[in-house]
Amino acid sequence: MGKPILLLPLGLSLLMSSLLALQCFRCESLDSTGLCRVGRRICQTYPDEICAWVVVTTRDGKFVYGNQSCAECIGTTVEHGSLIISTNCCSATPFCNMVHP
């Protein structure tokens, strides 16, 4: 009789963590229009993760690369040679990491 009682808190804990998780778009390679060309999926965040997307452009604004994921994320923009790498984060709503070039 003790085992079912012990399993109840574990089940409730798993249910709560899945309810609190955020769903995000996951794509290994976006094109310049924001469409996923490789690896289109949905991911669910783990603790400390949020929805993220990275866009790489040239200094004159030409699109080079983009991706979407669930990740630990800090929004930054970094210049590396002739490229600008923008890391963006969101957690307000599910699938908030949709890319609109």
Swiss-Prot record:
Keywords: Disulfide bond, Glycoprotein, Secreted, Signal. It is found in: Secreted. InterPro entries: LY6_UPA_recep-like. Pfam families: UPAR_LY6. Residues 1-21 form the signal peptide. N-glycosylated. It comes from the Eukaryota. Its main location: secreted. Disulfide bonds join C24-C51, C27-C36, C43-C70, C73-C89, C90-C96. The keyword Disulfide bond applies. Residues 22-99 form the UPAR/Ly6 domain. Glycans are attached at N67. One of its GO terms (cellular component) is extracellular region. This is Urinary protein 1. It comes from Rattus norvegicus (Rat).
